[in-house]
Amino acid sequence: MPGLLKKGGPKVFIAEHLPQLIRVLSEGEFDGVFSEVTATGIYANLRLSDAWLIQAAGRVADFDGVYGTQNALSDRAFVVDYSSPNVAKRLHAGHIRSTIIGHILSNLYDASGATVYRVNHINDFGGFGYTLQGYRQFAGQFPAGMNENDRLIEIYQIRRALERVAGGGQDAAGWDPADASVLQRYLPEVTDLASAQAAAARFTADSDQRFAALEAGDEEEVRLWQDLVAVSLASFDEFYDQLGISFDFVLGESLYLQAGTEVVERALAEGTAVVYTQELADGDLAGLRAQVDAGTMSAQEYESAARAIAKDVGATVVPLDKGERYVVVRADGRSIYATRDIGAVEIRTDLFGATDLVYVVGQEQRVHFDRLFRAAGRLGLIEDGLPRTLHVYFGFYVDATSGKKLSSRDSVSNVMGLLAAAFDYFRASLSDRISGGEDEIAAAARSLAVGSLVFNDLKKDLRSAVEIDSRDLQRTISEFERSGGAYVIYAAVRARSILRRVSDRGLSVGSLGSGGSGYELDDQEALLALRLLTLPDQIVAAAQQSNPAVLVRHMLDIANIYNSYYSRAAVIADDSVNPVRYRLTQATANALTSALEICHIEVPAAI
């Protein structure tokens, strides 16, 4: 129609084409769909008939399965990389965001007809030399009764304490008390800055040798590495079990080492990757100095870039545009994260036939993924725009008082604590409201806890920071509750409760006749029906935009309308059931339950 309007102009469109449009919309397959079809200027005004809306709401009510599923993305295969914890480290609060966002994005793609592979990319290789060395070096010094997983975390704490002290430039009087305590227990010879720096150098050198042996396939190192990885994976499963989340594949980055190495070797032979020589570095430095002279770069920016250039000399890099480069192998020939990430692109494309590679990782990795995707294109791993690559990033957890980013050590480093706090909060609030037993209360508390965490993460811009008051988790969970997850769950529970009451009382639901003809919907009923009917479109839109907030906001809209509607429009009155209100309630229950399922939230029997 816009083409006809543009071609003939408004006068011709109004005189010739608009009457034809009005006629088509008033008969044939559209007969009974619209109660009013009129023309005003160049516009056709349509009003859906009450009978058609009631029929359509009935189809929503009777839908078998997850309402809203479609085949809009049936020609696409998504590999979604999310959660991605580090072996030998404790899960921190940020892993909640990655896990929830990635899992629900996967559900959205799946509900829209795509083939989806959910991949937990375990960081099980990079930096593991420190773990292997620490496990042997400090084996006799761990506290009695400390389990294997806590030993791995303790090794990481030792390493970080040593790095902070050695790099801090202060003698013992200026050390953080926690760091000083760790070093006193495990490295008593470290008493001043000089001894700390010497110990750090030895530990790093020994760890590098361990990693080189692991990378070369040394049997003893590989066996210990496998055992320690298994310990970490078992601890991660406790977190995933509590969230009720599973993956199609749990794959360590080590899987991609050989593929990444082969890609780099091929690129060197083809010239798409080069060894970053001092000559190349000097050329880049000259270019940077020219920018400083031209006033387009500050002296501080130059110094930072110059340090990065000096660090990269001797490394294998993929030259990028804008004078940037992507380091894929260290100067000493050792692999790095980038080596394995390049291998992952190739394997995921070949093994899964991926048309889309989605990485759900925090915003601190934006530069890395930008360069990874550009390098993959240069290396021929992306051809004709396929696979599509997307980094879905999210904001930091920040201190509720200072607004500063929380580190793993300072924040809720044990994710189980945050989930347990949410569960306890809701269980306490439900204990005097649910007449059922402890199992029913626990199920409802779990649903509300997960629902509040999910909606808090998804309702707003994913890039926004999330405030955590680590001194008062109850306050944080209370804020999460206000995000709306509990409100949507309440609407679904209320709708299902009304339906159950009709069934339990053996009440009959009167016939609607020919699709509800003769019943006049009020404006709120018509709006509710429209929102229910457009839910499938919102699911697809959320999937296409890789933005769960599109669906979450629509769910909140439906819940808001229904919670207002049922309080004024009784479904049951004097043992008589209003059939239209009953069907709208059925449709609401089905739609919200389905949408909540996509958001990984179960609807409890009562709250």
Residue ranges and their predicted role:
Residues 55-60:
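Short, charged, solvent-exposed linker or helix-capping segments at domain edges/interfaces
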Residues 1-54, 65, 72-607:
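Non-catalytic interaction-recognition regions
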